[in-house]
Design a protein with these regions (language model features):
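Catalytic alpha/beta core domains of metabolic enzymes, predominantly
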Residues: 117-126, 132-184
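Active-site beta->alpha loop and helix N-cap motifs at the rims of alpha/beta catalytic domains
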Residues: 1-139
Length: 184
């Protein structure tokens, strides 16, 4: 799925007109889906309110006619839960969870336990994780990914940010219905 970028006005507020034009262009070219709030959208720099506005902008402009993938990143566990609720309310097709990035020195165990605690809030929405060890220094090994896959029937996606050589090796270890999207 193409991902929308965050654009800003001179006063540093979101340029919703330009972002809406971006969404319309993606729809016009016949994309099979659209994503938002990933690293390209500068999600870590946005406020909760701005993230909510972008989720609603996507939903309102896609009219639920093309799948939407919403990346969730917050400053606290509670903020993650609230953003998941916003994404679900706006009928996100997929929810992609980023690790809690308070520090780049998060162990794999802490990252895994965070996802394990958070995934139940996604309920029946397809959920995945942003697994970008090479890029952001935080992520899960294939062993932990498979553990999540076996534990949650809706855990069916990974958003990678790795080289094609690295991601090819990872994909070979996963079941066919665990979708892997990669891009940088």
């Amino acid at each position: 799925f193409p991902i929308i970028y965050s654009f800003f006005n001179k006063n540093n507020s979101l340029d919703l007109k330009l972002m809406k034009e971006q969404i319309q262009l993606i729809k016009k070219i016949g994309s099979n889906g659209i994503a938002c709030l990933g690293l390209a959208t500068e999600v870590q720099k946005l406020s909760f309110k701005e993230k909510k506005v972008i989720i609603e902008l996507i939903a309102n402009n896609c009219n639920y006619k093309i799948p939407t993938a919403i990346t969730i990143q917050g400053n606290t566990f509670d903020e993650y839960v609230k953003l998941i609720e916003v994404a679900r309310f706006n009928q996100a097709s997929w929810i992609i969870l980023q690790p809690l990035l308070k520090t780049k020195h998060i162990s794999e165990t802490v990252c895994y336990n965070f996802y394990k605690k958070l995934i139940p809030f996604t309920k029946d929405t397809i959920v995945g994780v942003q697994n970008a060890i090479e890029y952001i220094g935080v992520g899960l090994t294939p062993k932990k990914i498979l553990k999540l896959y076996k534990s949650f029937p809706n855990f069916r996606a990974i958003k990678g940010e790795a080289s094609s050589v690295f991601i090819e090796k990872e994909i070979s270890r996963y079941p066919k219905n665990l979708h892997v999207f990669n891009g940088r």
